[in-house]
């Protein structure tokens, strides 16, 4: 759970806006959290995007995608929301000053990780990857490509490890398939168990958890 630090205008509005995930397990778990706290959420229809908190007319509930919740908190159009910390850190440049993390909820857990082909047997750390990137550019005349939906997190992490001689390729889904399709040499994506990465012959360097 997180909220925007810019709450000064809440009292000028009639409603406190709570943004929660609009579908799937995240929606179900979000509803369960509030229900257990004695604050059940009432959605306007199974597919509606508006709702309310039972017994509290000052709270307006809005059902949006997890990614959009981060953007809503950043712009101040939602005051509290349930979303992933990875999305918050990716979407909000001044994350530490703009957002207050209230509590981890224990569901939807996953890490943002660097993943490389299993065949790169000599690459076990990010320093190794930095060396490979330099060698790749010298040999092929172009930079090693990294497919990801997390451009900001990836840029910062790679720079901290001296592996910034890479080209980011924007991914719109199924990022784990980019190396096998030839769209990229490595990826940065979320992973909870590593099973999907393993199924695509990818692995995480020892220090590759962002």
Labelled PLM ranges:
Residues 9-210:
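Domain-level signature for soluble enzymes in the chorismate/prephenate branch of the shikimate pathway
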């Amino acid at each position: 759970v997180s909220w925007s630090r810019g709450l000064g205008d809440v009292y000028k509005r009639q409603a406190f806006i709570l943004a929660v995930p609009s579908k799937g397990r995240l929606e179900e778990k979000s509803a369960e959290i509030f229900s257990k706290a004695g604050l059940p959420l009432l959605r306007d229809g199974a597919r509606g995007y508006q709702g309310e908190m039972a017994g509290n007319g000052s709270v307006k509930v809005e059902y949006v995608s997890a990614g959009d919740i981060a953007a809503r908190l950043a712009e101040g159009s939602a005051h509290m929301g349930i979303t992933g910390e990875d999305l918050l850190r990716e979407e909000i440049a001044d994350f530490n000053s703009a957002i207050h993390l209230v509590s981890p909820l224990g569901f939807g857990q996953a890490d943002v990780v660097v993943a490389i082909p299993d065949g790169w047997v000599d690459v076990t750390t990010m320093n190794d990857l930095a060396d490979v990137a330099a060698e790749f550019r010298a040999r092929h005349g172009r930079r090693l490509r990294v497919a990801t939906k997390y451009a900001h997190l990836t840029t910062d992490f790679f720079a901290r490890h001296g592996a910034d001689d890479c080209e980011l390729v924007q991914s719109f889904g199924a990022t784990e398939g980019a190396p096998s399709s030839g769209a990229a040499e490595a990826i940065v994506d979320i992973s909870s168990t590593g099973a999907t990465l393993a199924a695509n012959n990818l692995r995480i360097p020892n220090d590759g958890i962002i």
